[in-house]
Every structure is written in structure tokens, then in C-alpha cells.
Swiss-Prot record:
Pfam families recorded: ATP-gua_Ptrans, ATP-gua_PtransN
UniProt protein name: Arginine kinase
EC number: 2.7.3.3
Organism of provenance: Stichopus japonicus
Residue intervals of the Phosphagen kinase C-terminal domain: 115-358
EC top class, as a word: transferase
């Protein structure tokens, strides 16, 4: 809840100190804009100060903004719009997003299993009418858990599985699931603590997975749901087919049982807590062995030119182990799910081709995108 004493002071005395900050928040939030929006709140009571706290606390963060509900993006559009435009490659406030979940349009190419260890597609979805994780109250969070877990328990055939509440899970089991990359980590990072997303942990949180452990749903991590399809090897089409089928089933069961739908609009696509995930929310990734590419100074630049993102073996801010990298789509907003997945397939094929050439001591100059 906002401090009611705040209104006794002029907005200029409340403006954050952005000295040494690198975020898009610090670039676009002016004193005049802050004065205009400081005392405004969304219908559920989320304020500008809550939306920017994540960035105020962390000078090194790239964005520095989090939504507390679906309306955050319209009520505070003066700030969010320019941040979204710069982060999402020029996506303007007049642009519309496009959605395409047709698995038949995914390229048939199976990525070379000698280089690709595993493939994964994930997205986030939030339930309309409920606050997002920086602003959600305990009763809402528990209602989301009940709603989603009951919908998931309706899945059948190869998607049939079980829900595991973190409240009922012992520490050893929880850590094993984290180590196996099935479960999200405990919310101890600055992103979660500053953003108010670690509150009440592990209350209302859990993981659901099918019997084969290749279709998973995280409940109440950063978003209400994180829906994940994954498997060993490089058959991304198979991964995406299961992903879309499971996603469609979950949405249908939630709507049939509760009348609720996912947050979505024509402009931003699927509405998620962090502006970086707006649009498809899709992160299509592979773990690929690229030890020779890692020694090439152009590696990151090559990935960026192909609209790919390179991370360490265990994700963002981690190092590569044994030359294994996490390679994923860079874009989320303005292009469809099918386009983003196909971008990864095509790009990783090129990276593997480069790796093979480097193994033989050959030049990759002819393969480097201009």
C-alpha cells in the first residue's frame, strides 16, 4: 500500500536518485513525468513507485520496470511505451502484435544431436482480473494456484500428470528439482526481492509436470504460469507441437471451469509481468556444444545479427560449462511464435555449421551474417 504521507511532499522531493544508473527507466522517467504520475494508481491500487522500485534499487538492471496488473501498461503508458519501443527493437505504441501457434508451420529440420543436447520452449500466461506477482495478495495467489492446478489435473493421455505444491515439498526434493532444471529457483535474486515477487514464498507456489516430465507448468513464479515443453535432442518441432497442444488445453480448461481468460490485447500480445516478455512470452532455446565458437570474439555479435541471445549453461548471468551455451530467440514482441521458433532453428543450424568449420581449422567468414 502507498504511504499516504507521500502526498504531503512535492513530487520533486520524491524523485529517485538515478546517479550511475544504466536502465531504460532512468533514461525515460523525467521529473515532470514523475510529478504527473506519482499520485496515480491502477484500479487495483498499483502505483508508479511500486512499478519502478525494481529499477531504483538496481542501477545495473536494463529495464527497471515491472507491471503489477494488466492496467499498468495503459495507466503508466507515458513511461512504459518508450521503454517498450527501445527494448523491443522499435515496436511503437501504434503497432500491433501477431500470434501464430500453428505447429505445422515449424521447420522440419532436426538439429544435429552431436551438438544440440536439449530443446525447450516456454511462455508465460497471466489470468485476467488478478494482480500480477509484484502486487498480488495472498488470497489471489492461492486462488490462482487452485484454478491452474485444477485445470492441469484435467489433462489426459501424454499430458497427464500431477501437481506438487512447494508448501508440501521437503527441502531435499525441492533442491533436486532445481538442480535437474525442472523447478524455478528460490526467489532470492534482486529481481524478485526488489520487485516484491518473493513475498510469502513458498505460499501459493508449485510445479506441475506430466508423467514423462517433458511438459511442465510453474505456478506463481514471476507470472501466474510458466508453461514449458522440453526434451533431449534437437527436434524442436516435436517440442513446439506438445507446447501448443498443452497450452491450448490449459487455457480451455481454465475458461470452461472458471470463465477466466488469459491477459492479452492486440497491441502488446500476451501481457506479462516484465516488459521484456511482452508479445509471445516465448523463449525457444537449445543447449548447444559450441566450444570453438566460444573462442571467436564475434560470437555474441553473430548471435545478435541472427536475432539470437547467447547465455551460459545455466541461463542468464552464468558461465558456460564445457563449451555448452543456451541459445534462444532475442525477439518476443512484433513477431509470432512460429517466426521466433523458426528463427532459432535456422540460426542454430548456422552456428553448428560454423562450429564444424572451426573444428577443421577452416574460416567461417563466408557464414558470418552481414
Amino acid at each position: 500500500m502507498a504511504n499516504l504521507n507521500q502526498k504531503k511532499y512535492p513530487a520533486k522531493d520524491d524523485f529517485p536518485n538515478f546517479e550511475g544508473h544504466k536502465s531504460l527507466l532512468s533514461k525515460y522517467l523525467t521529473a515532470d513525468m514523475y510529478a504527473k504520475l506519482r499520485d496515480v494508481a491502477t484500479p487495483s491500487g498499483y502505483t508508479l513507485d511500486r512499478a519502478i522500485q525494481n529499477g531504483v534499487d538496481n542501477p545495473d538492471f536494463h529495464l527497471g520496470l515491472l507491471a503489477g496488473d494488466e492496467e499498468t501498461y495503459t495507466v503508466f503508458a507515458d513511461l512504459f511505451d518508450p521503454v517498450i519501443e527501445e527494448y523491443h527493437n522499435g515496436f511503437k505504441k501504434t503497432d500491433n502484435h501477431k500470434t501464430d501457434l500453428d505447429a505445422s508451420k515449424i521447420l522440419d529440420d532436426v538439429l544435429d544431436p552431436a551438438y544440440v543436447i536439449s530443446s525447450r520452449v516456454r511462455t508465460g500466461r497471466n489470468i485476467r482480473g488478478m494482480a500480477l506477482s509484484p502486487h498480488v495478495c495472498r488470497s489471489e495467489r492461492r486462488a490462482i494456484e487452485k484454478m491452474v492446478s485444477e485445470a492441469l489435473n484435467s489433462l489426459a493421455a501424454d499430458l497427464k500428470g500431477k501437481y506438487y505444491s512447494l508448501m508440501k515439498m521437503d527441502e531435499k526434493t525441492q533442491q533436486q528439482l532445481i538442480d535437474d532444471h525442472f523447478l524455478f529457483d528460490r526467489p532470492v535474486s534482486r529481481h524478485f526481492t526488489s520487485g516484491g515477487m518473493a513475498r510469502d514464498f513458498p505460499d501459493g507456489r508449485g510445479i506441475w509436470h506430466n508423467d514423462k516430465k517433458n511438459f511442465l507448468v510453474w505456478i506463481n513464479e514471476e507470472d501466474h504460469t510458466r508453461i514449458i515443453s522440453m526434451q533431449m535432442g534437437g527436434n524442436m518441432k516435436e517440442v513446439f507441437e506438445r507446447f501448443t497442444r498443452g497450452l491450448t488445453e490449459v487455457e480451455k480448461h481454465i475458461k470452461d471451469k472458471t470463465g477466466k481468460e488469459f491477459m492479452k490485447n492486440d497491441h502488446l500480445g500476451f501481457v506479462l509481468t516484465c516488459p521484456s516478455n511482452l508479445g509471445t512470452g516465448v523463449r525457444c532455446s537449445v543447449h548447444a556444444k559450441l566450444p570453438h565458437m566460444a573462442k571467436d570474439k564475434r560470437f555474441e555479435e553473430i548471435c545478435t545479427k541472427m536475432r539470437l541471445q547467447k547465455r551460459g549453461t545455466s541461463g542468464e548471468f552464468t558461465e558456460s560449462v564445457g563449451g555448452v551455451y543456451d541459445i534462444s530467440n532475442l525477439d518476443r514482441l512484433g513477431s509470432s511464435e512460429v517466426e521466433q521458433v523458426n528463427c532459432v532453428i535456422k540460426g542454430v543450424k548456422v552456428l553448428i555449421e560454423m562450429e564444424k568449420k572451426l573444428e577443421k581449422g577452416e574460416s567461417i567468414d563466408d557464414l558470418v551474417p552481414k
